[in-house]
Amino acid sequence: MKLIESNDTVVFPEGVTFTVKNRIVHVTGPRGTIRKDFRHLHMEMERIGKSTLRVRKWFGVRKELAAIRTVCSHIKNMIKGVTVGFRYKMRSVYAHFPINVTLQDGNRTVEIRNFLGEKIVRRVPLPEGVIATISTAQKDEIVVEGNDVQFVSQAAARIQQSTAVKEKDIRKFLDGIYVSEKTTIVPTD
């Protein structure tokens, strides 16, 4: 069944501005600017007034209508990113061989050494706009921060996947670097 018209709106808070042109959305806030390209989805995106964006689909089937809510969720994540940012805290877990984590290239590359006693050095490059720091308050903790939740979570996933245990029983060998907490950079009430 096709609905004639389906839409959803996103209201932007005070201090956050946006522009829409050819389904490319730019959101600007106190922490910076994020740009997302939605040209692969066939739907209308139009500005209503100063602070509202309407996403509309005409004669859509079920999957196309689901994409409306997905686009609105992405835009809300962009708003959250330019206002409060995203922070993922990761902890190294090891049983015998301590995992050594260092940062290279101005906190743009994470180097992992001595994983399961191996001599190989694992290097994980971070996406643009994402920085990593080693926590001084907590032992064996890496903090990954940025404005775009997709890039921050992708960086955390790459770090976690680089320490995947191969050819051993994963119930016994639990060593690795895992996400322990997902928060925002600016504390919210």
UniProtKB/Swiss-Prot annotation:
UniProt keyword Nucleus, yes or no: no
Protein species of origin: Caenorhabditis elegans
Source organism phylogeny: Eukaryota, Metazoa, Ecdysozoa, Nematoda, Chromadorea
Protein name in the entry: Large ribosomal subunit protein uL6
Any coiled-coil regions, as ranges: none
Entry's family note: Belongs to the universal ribosomal protein uL6 family.
GO cellular component: a single term: cytosolic large ribosomal subunit
InterPro entries for the chain: Ribosomal_uL6-like (IPR000702), Ribosomal_uL6-like_a/b-dom_sf (IPR036789), Ribosomal_uL6_a/b-dom (IPR020040), Ribosomal_uL6_CS2 (IPR002359)
Molecular function as annotated in GO: rRNA binding; structural constituent of ribosome
Gene Ontology terms describing biological process: cytoplasmic translation; determination of adult lifespan
Stored SUPFAM superfamilies: Ribosomal protein L6 (SSF56053)
Keywords: Ribonucleoprotein, Ribosomal protein
Family annotation (Pfam families): Ribosomal_L6 (PF00347)
